[in-house]
Each structure stands twice: as C-alpha cells, then as structure tokens.
C-alpha cells in the first residue's frame, strides 16, 4: 500500500481498498477541491480532511462510522428539552453561515479553511451540499451541513452556540430524512459525541456497498427546497 499523488489534470481516485492502515484510511494527497473532484470522491466513499498549510489529504477509513437515522439516541433530558424547544429549524436557509459557524466554533483550530468553505459553497450552489439551521428567534445558534448522495447523507460538521442546538439539528433532520425515504448518514470517523448519538462502526466494504446502492436512490424532488422543518410551540 502506498500513498497516491493525485493529478490536477484528472479527477480519478485510486480504490479505497488501497488506503493505508496507519494512519487509518489515508488514501491520496493533492489534486484540488473542484466540484467535479469532490463529487467523484463522495461517490467513491472518499472525503478530504487536512490541516491548514498541509496538502489536501483524502481518506476512506476502515471501519466507517455511520448512523442509521432510526437508531438516533435521544436522552430523556433531550426529549424533554425538545418538547419545549425554543428553537426553529430550517433547511438550506443559510448554508454559508452554517459552514462559517462550523469553521469558527473550533477552539483548537479547524480543517475548514477558507478554500474548503468556498469549495463546499460551490457544491451547495450546484445542489449537492445542504445545511440545517437552528435559530433562537433571529439568531443562528447551531447547525450542520453535508453532501447528499441519493438516500445517503454524508455529514461533514456541526456546531452549537446554545444548549442542545446541534442535537436539535440532527434530531429534526433525522425525522425529516427518514420520513422522505432517507436511509443512512455517514459520520466518517467515530468519536465520543457521535457514538453517544447512536453512531456505530461498520466495515468499509459494507459502507461502500451501501453507498453504491443508496446513491442511486432518490428523495422527493422538493426535499432539499429551503423550508422550515420545525417551529417552537406557541
């Protein structure tokens, strides 16, 4: 196994099965963040993740962290909070603000550089990247964004500036996603936070099989239309 240097003149990727075991899932470096290359990556189960100043690194870890939306774990306290939630939740109202929020709300730095923000904003304008916003009155207090692949959603990042804001984003999105035929959420790499929400690890081979099936599926044509998903009770 060896690390592959990508060409700027081709958007082809090597097979994810050739990714390194250590660091787990590192597959290639270089290339660019053009919409065509990003979409090719997601279609093959590959995503970019790198530190500012480093070359673009491309990953496909084994195992892969996923969340079956129906298995989302909601604690009793979160259920009580949501019943009296002060938040309004929207979809695709403020993609730019959400990704900026994800980039700025990291105390120890972030991989979401200016170039990454611009790249995913282009994907959003093309209808492939989407955001969920959580509002307290007119203030954006949390949210999440990711890339759609048919009935699979590749979650990228989330942020929270008030109590339970990011959990509210995920809860409301999962309910809406399941209700319209969504099947699976890609969480990339398991961490304590995603594990507490019900995410689990599956073999990369299984994830790629799910991806190949689900990316050909379709949600309703109007699913990603900007709209309000949840409003607080009066």
Curated annotation (Swiss-Prot):
One of its GO terms (biological process) is protein catabolic process. Keywords: Acyltransferase, Cytoplasm, Transferase. The gene is aat. It is an enzyme of class 2 (transferase). Belongs to the L/F-transferase family. One of its GO terms (cellular component) is cytoplasm. Its main location: cytoplasm. Its EC number is 2.3.2.6. It catalyses: N-terminal L-lysyl-[protein] + L-leucyl-tRNA(Leu) = N-terminal L-leucyl-L-lysyl-[protein] + tRNA(Leu) + H(+); N-terminal L-arginyl-[protein] + L-leucyl-tRNA(Leu) = N-terminal L-leucyl-L-arginyl-[protein] + tRNA(Leu) + H(+); L-phenylalanyl-tRNA(Phe) + an N-terminal L-alpha-aminoacyl-[protein] = an N-terminal L-phenylalanyl-L-alpha-aminoacyl-[protein] + tRNA(Phe). The keyword Transferase applies. This is Leucyl/phenylalanyl-tRNA--protein transferase. Gene3D superfamilies: Leucyl/phenylalanyl-tRNA-protein transferase, C-terminal domain (3.40.630.70), Leucyl/phenylalanyl-tRNA-protein transferase, N-terminal domain (3.30.70.3550).
């Amino acid at each position: 196994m060896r690390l592959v240097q990508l060409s700027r003149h081709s958007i082809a990727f090597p097979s994810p099965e050739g990714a390194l075991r250590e660091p787990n899932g590192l597959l290639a470096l270089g290339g660019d963040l053009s919409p065509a290359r990003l979409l090719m990556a997601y279609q093959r189960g590959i995503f970019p993740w790198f530190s500012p100043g480093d070359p673009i690194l491309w990953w496909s870890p084994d195992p892969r962290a996923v969340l079956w939306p129906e298995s989302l774990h909601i604690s009793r306290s979160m259920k009580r909070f949501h019943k009296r939630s002060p938040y309004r939740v929207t979809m695709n109202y403020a993609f730019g603000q959400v990704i900026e929020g994800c980039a700025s709300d990291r105390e120890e730095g972030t991989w979401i550089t200016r170039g990454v923000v611009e790249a995913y904003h282009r994907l959003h304008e093309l209808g492939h990247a989407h955001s969920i916003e959580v509002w307290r009155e007119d203030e954006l207090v949390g949210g999440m964004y990711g890339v759609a692949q048919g009935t699979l959603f590749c979650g990228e990042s989330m942020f929270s500036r008030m109590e339970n804001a990011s959990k509210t984003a995920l809860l409301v999105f999962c309910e809406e996603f399941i209700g319209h035929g969504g099947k699976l959420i890609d969480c990339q790499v398991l961490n304590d936070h995603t594990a507490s929400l019900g995410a689990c690890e599956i073999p990369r081979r299984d994830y790629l099989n799910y991806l190949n099936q689900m990316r050909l599926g379709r949600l309703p044509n109007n699913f990603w239309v900007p709209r309000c998903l949840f409003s607080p009770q009066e």
